[in-house]
Amino acid sequence: MKLRLLATIMAVLASAHTARAQAMFPSETDNAALRYWFALGEVQEPSDDATRRLFEETTAGRVAWDESKLGPILDFNEDALRTMQQATKLPECNWGFEYRNGAAIPPWFALRARLLSRLNELQGIRDMAHGDSGTAVNTWLAGVHFGQDMSRSGPVIAALTAHAIILDNLQPLRDSAQQGKLNEEQKAELSVVVKTIPEDGFDWGVAWGVEFAIGDQFLQKSRTARKPESDDKIRAYEEYMLAAQAVLRETPAEAESRIADLEPNLRRLGKVEQNLIPSLRGTNEARIRLVTARDELMQALSTK
C-alpha cells in the first residue's frame, strides 16, 4: 500500500515538473514584425565619415568590396541582419500600430529600416566578393521580402520606405545578372521567384487606406473644434481618398491619366484636407521606379 502511494506521489510530482518545464517554452510567434523590431533596435551605422562614404560608394558599385574596412561593420551588425533575414521566412507581419488610437510611426523607424536594408545589400556584396553567389542572391531576396513586409499595415511613409528597400536589393540582383556573376541555373531559379513579386512591389492602396483612416479620424475629431470642418469638405476628402486608392490598384501606366483627372478634385478640397493628403503623383512615380527595376532584372535574367 505504501509503495503504491509513493509511486502515485512520484507520478504527480513528475507530471507537475513536466508541466512547468513545458510552460517555460511557449511556441514562437509567426509575426515577423516582432523580430524586425529587435533587429531595428540593434542595428548600428558606421561611426566615422570615411567608412560611411566607403559604404555608400560600395553599395553604389563605384568601388570594389574592401573586407578590412567594411567587414567589421557587417560583423558588428551580424545579429541584427540574421534576425531580419530569419523574420522574412515567417508568414505574417503586423507592425502593431493602432493609427485610429493616435499611434504614429517613430521618427527613427524609417531611418533604421533603410540602414538595415543597406547593410543587407552590403552583406550580399560581401558574399559575392567571396565567391558565394547563391548566398548573395538569397541575401538580396530576403531584403526584397523585408521591404514588402515594411509596407504592410503602414501609411504612405512606410510604403515609400518599403519601395526604397526593395530597390536597394533588386538593383544588385540586376547588376549581378548583367555582369555574368550568376550561372544559368541560378538565373532560371531567380526568374521564377521574381515573377511572383508584384510589378510595383506590393499593394500601395493599403498605405493610402491607412492615410485615409488617419485623416478621417482627424477630421471627425475636428467637428468638436471651435471652427469645425464642414460635412461637405469631409465628404469631398473621403471621396478623393477612395478614388486615390482605386487608382493605385491599377497599373502605374494606367494610373497616370487617372491621377491627372483627379487633380481638379484635389485643388477643390479645403486647405486642411489638402494638407492631410500625400502626393498621389509622387506615389505613382515610386511605383514606376519599382516596375522599371523589376523589368530590368527580368531582362538581365533572360539574357544568355
Regions found by a protein language model. Name each.
Residues A16-K304:
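Short acidic linear motifs
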Residues M1-A7:
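Bacterial N-terminal signal peptides that target proteins for export
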Residues A7-A16:
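Bacterial N-terminal signal peptides
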